[in-house]
Amino acid sequence: MIRRTLVGASADPVAAYPVKTGALVKTIVLCSGGLDSVTLAHKVAAESTLTRLVSFDYRQRHNKELEYARRCATRLTAPHDVVDIAAVGRLLTGSALTSGGAVPEGHYAEETMRVTVVPNRNAIMLAIAFGVAAAERADAVAAAVHGGDHFIYPDCRPAFVEAFETMQRHALDGVARISFSTPFLRMSKADIVREGARLEVPFAETWSCYKGGALHCGRCGTCVERREAFHLAGVDDPTPYEDPDYWVEACRKHRARQLS
């Protein structure tokens, strides 16, 4: 179910509004090329009307993910735009994903992973996507934020999603009806893998590794999360890793720290 805002200026644009569901919903998907967003694109294509994939080049060290977003768009015969915000990315220093620091290795829920936070990344991308949606009269913008992101990334949490949607209702009041679709918000990565398997997503055609090498490294937080998710979901992982077994020890150490 996707909610919609009311068109027309109002004293309270945050009030209750009509519901639009199913194939009638014209949806733009933010797609990085990763497992979560590619699965979301397939889900939207199967259940709604996928109007466009929007990706962002913000000088991320793993920008090879954008090629996987392009492949997804081709597979789903959807228009695909890569928005160049490299000038913005240059200003967002301090993150291991945009600056010269090393990408941390280990479990994705460790405190050390906080260096992968890019300040305000989702808010910036979503603001652009909502503008695109308004311009082309789409009904919704969909993003693949999920439960596994909540610990590290503040702009993936339920409170952010609710606040951002409220802000957009005010920003577009009297202009457009755009809702914020986040079907994975309270799901685990393993849940998303199961959903992707149901939708027959070609998982080998997705990219997660933050290091951006020739293969998934198998050691960074996103590689560990990806490998563990397939294991917990009971789904074969087609991904070739440079270190395919590191995740086991990383998960064991994380559990031990939680119990200590």
Regions found by a protein language model. Give the residues of each.
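ATP-dependent adenylation/nucleotidyltransferase module used to activate substrates
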Residues: Y17-L199
